[in-house]
Amino acid sequence: MLVKQGFYMHVIKFLQKYIVGFVFISGVIVMSGVGVIYFQVKDELPQIPKNLRYINQQPPTEIYSRDGKVLKILGDRSYMTLDLISPHFQKAIIAVEDSTFYEHHGLDPVSILRAFYKNTVKGKTAQGGSTITQQLAKNLFFSFEKSYERKLKELLMAFQIESTFSKPEILEAYANQVYFGKGAYGINRASQVYFGKNPSELSLLQSAILAAIPKSPNKVNPINNKEASIHRASYVLQRMVDEGYIDETQRAEALRSELDIRKANRKQNPDSYFLD
């Protein structure tokens, strides 16, 4: 009996080493391949500015009704430095979107392999694999066209961004340009639209609610679908527990706390229904 147990333990340890080795080698191959391709096509890539915040400072688009009243302002982005954004939100968005953000260099090979396995082998499509830096590159420099060429350039731009800017600068730029639904681009506008407060004032639950939105801005925002929003926020909070940002008690307290959603202003602007 002891011989069998020893044999099984030996097999398990061997398989563990094999899997870890496979993942490591695959990661090295991916990183090396991307590096080689980068030097081949780097002249075709967009130029990165000296300061990422300048890209976010685009003039907003105003939508008017037939009688000349402003119905909605799209792309109204007031840039917030990281110290003006709730630490709860910073931790929440990292936990749910890119848990290895402070460890990778723009690309997370393990996440890509995991996403490939779940999407291809198991037939699931919920797994993305894109890091925060990749998402930033896509949102700032590329269209949302789905093609291998666009994805490759996105990866290369992510490397370039990581080699040019610090992690806080990248996180700050991401928080200021990501789309939160309801015409809200950036954390400042999202905080005002959904909760009527500044980003620094967001509670833990409100931070989780906002961090949950970018995955599906129109379906998982608290104005369109409060139940789905809270369900997704519960998952975000669990990810924060998994990453050691909060404990189970804090998660439970957050889910019991008051959300204080700002009501959609449909009575004053009934035409805004067509803008959702």
Stretch-by-stretch model annotation:
Residues 2-276:
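Juxtamembrane regions of bacterial inner-membrane/periplasmic proteins
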